[in-house]
Design a protein with these regions (language model features):
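PRPP-associated nucleotide enzymes
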Residues: 1-215
Length: 215
């Protein structure tokens, strides 16, 4: 299932607008903070789907019954662009386990896209809820390869993908090719990719905007 959060008017859309704005992007601290806020809100929305149990909490004046989550998810992010989104999700799920994986485009000299997946640090995922954070879903290829690599650490009972912006083609590709039913939570879905497989209108390169241009 795909959840496009920006379709409902809220403060969330201001954060999406600011990460797109080429003038606001010049302030990398603000860019990172906005992605972090987006992660916090995506985490809040995902939290509504988790399992809860009524729990008694003692107050100074008595007891209160509150529905609390029965487990914390595992939050995985794709380095390096996913780190700010990861931090936002971790602000929401502050007792979550964490996983990190690298995925990057390797130049081929052609129009073909070659994605490399190398470093991985991940706990056992068996029967856990997994949230994979990546701010931009352009072609969906990186996410599909990361998905495959993470599943070598066990099969989660539920998987969520959290992204700020996705292309329509990436959404379609992931819906068709992911081996396990997955909920995709995204701020906005853009219709086009350019010749270099960047989302249009998108926002540019999220990793460079957050952490500086890479060599």
């Amino acid at each position: 299932m795909v959840h496009e959060i920006g379709k409902t008017n809220s403060i969330f859309n201001h954060f999406i607008a600011e990460i797109r704005d080429e003038e606001v992007q010049k302030d990398s601290l603000r860019f990172r903070r906005n992605l972090e806020r987006i992660g916090e809100i995506l985490g809040y929305e995902i939290s509504k789907t988790l399992t809860y149990k009524e729990t008694e909490v003692k107050t100074p004046l008595g007891e209160a019954n509150v529905e609390l989550m029965t487990e914390q998810p595992v939050i995985a992010s794709i380095l390096r662009a996913g780190l700010t989104l990861h931090n936002g999700l971790l602000n929401t799920f502050d007792k979550a386990e964490n996983a990190f994986i690298s995925a990057y485009r390797r130049p081929t000299g052609t129009d073909e896209i070659d994605v490399m997946v190398e470093y991985k640090a991940c706990p056992d995922l068996t029967d856990k809820t997994l949230i994979i954070a990546d701010p931009m879903l352009a072609t969906g290829l990186s996410m599909a390869l990361v998905f495959e690599a993470l599943l070598k650490n066990g099969t989660p009972k539920k998987i969520h993908i959290a992204a700020a912006i996705a292309s329509r083609s990436a959404i379609d590709m992931l819906k068709k090719n992911l081996p396990i039913p997955t909920d995709i939570w995204v701020g906005s879905i853009d219709e086009n990719l350019n010749a270099k497989s960047y989302i249009v209108p998108g926002l540019g390169d999220a990793g460079d905007l957050a952490y500086g241009v890479k060599l």
